[in-house]
């Protein structure tokens, strides 16, 4: 008999990968705002950000992948939406599990390296202070704290995975924007594009969950290579049979950013954004390698196969 698993966020980028990877080994029930579209037999239609349920099925494993990201809030209302989805969605899920007498053995929470609140640094580990101050980061920090207490009080094994930029087929966010820009010929590199960034392959995250959840704890997951912008640009351009993007000299980029400072929020780039783009930011996944033999793929080796 397959182990039962409750999955939130199955329609999202990472959630889809988790569903496809684990469905052969687990009896999966999904939770989502829309009807079941995932090819499995069981689905609970509900909006976790706004409602609770007393009818969740008893499952040994809960994987909470639903969340809100990739949007810079333009108003207090949009900022509040991060808390509704990331924090209160988590609270409502846990309260629904309790009301349904469906406390799991394992709880897996998909979090983010944004909780550290750093824009540059090398091999930042899990001991770093949680200084994230954006609505996205704060809502994830508060959800982590809530789950730590909730799971601890109920003897539930909690696994928190803090993820950087996630790569895979048709990725969202900045990586997706880079792919679209290079494909259309409208992408411009900046300077030497030597800044390195941590990334991780979605399929690797999905595949390691069954092993990692038995260890429990808090872990960064990365591909361990941390490619430079130039390596990502070259990989994407080669796979798409496009020219390697032209580069703007750093001096000109700084001038453009200076104009952006004057334009305010309307500007696509300013000095702060330029600094983030051109600064190395990597995270240490050594704890995961030691705890459950995390052996990820290099994203630049995998990315060309899905473009």
What are these regions (language model features)?
Residues 211-269, 305-307:
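Mid/C-terminal beta-alpha module of Rossmann-like enzyme folds, strongest
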Residues 133-159:
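Active-site Tyr-X1-5-Lys
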Residues 116-117, 159-177:
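Flexible, glycine-rich beta-alpha linker
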Residues 285-290, 294-307:
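Amphipathic terminal alpha-helices
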Residues 91-135:
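Conserved Rossmann-fold NAD(P)-dependent oxidoreductase catalytic core, especially the SDR/UDP-sugar
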Residues 5-24:
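N-terminal Rossmann NAD(P)H-binding glycine-rich loop of SDR-like oxidoreductase domains
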Residues 171-177, 191-213, 220:
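Substrate-positioning beta->alpha
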Residues 37, 48-88, 92:
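NAD(P)H-binding glycine-rich loop region in Rossmannoid oxidoreductase-like domains
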């Amino acid at each position: 008999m397959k182990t039962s698993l409750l999955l939130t966020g199955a329609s999202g980028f990472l959630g889809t990968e988790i569903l496809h990877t684990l469905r052969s080994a687990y009896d999966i029930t999904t939770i989502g705002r829309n009807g079941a579209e995932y090819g499995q037999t069981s689905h609970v239609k509900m909006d976790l950000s706004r409602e609770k349920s007393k009818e969740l099925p008893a499952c040994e494993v809960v994987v909470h992948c639903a969340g809100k990201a990739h949007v810079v809030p333009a108003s207090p209302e949009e900022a509040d939406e991060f808390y509704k989805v990331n924090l209160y969605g988590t609270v409502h899920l846990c309260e629904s599990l309790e009301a349904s007498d469906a406390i799991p053995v394992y709880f897996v929470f998909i979090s983010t390296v944004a909780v550290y609140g750093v824009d540059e640094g090398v091999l930042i580990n899990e001991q770093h202070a949680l200084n994230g101050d954006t609505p996205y980061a704060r809502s994830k920090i508060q959800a982590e704290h809530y789950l730590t207490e909730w799971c601890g009080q109920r003897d539930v094994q909690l696994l928190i995975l803090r993820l950087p930029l996630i790569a895979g087929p048709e990725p969202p966010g900045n990586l997706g924007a880079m792919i679209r820009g290079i494909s259309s010929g409208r992408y411009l590199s900046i300077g030497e594009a030597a800044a390195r960034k941590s990334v991780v392959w979605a399929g690797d995250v999905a595949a390691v969950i069954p092993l990692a959840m038995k260890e429990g704890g808090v872990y960064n997951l990365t591909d361990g290579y941390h490619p430079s912008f130039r390596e990502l640009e070259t990989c994407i351009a080669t796979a798409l049979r496009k020219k390697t993007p032209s580069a703007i000299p750093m001096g000109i980029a700084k001038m453009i950013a200076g104009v952006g400072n004057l334009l305010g929020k309307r500007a696509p780039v300013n000095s702060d954004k330029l600094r983030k783009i051109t600064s190395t930011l990597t995270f240490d996944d050594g704890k995961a390698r030691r705890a459950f033999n995390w052996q990820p793929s290099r994203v630049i080796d995998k990315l060309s196969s899905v473009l």
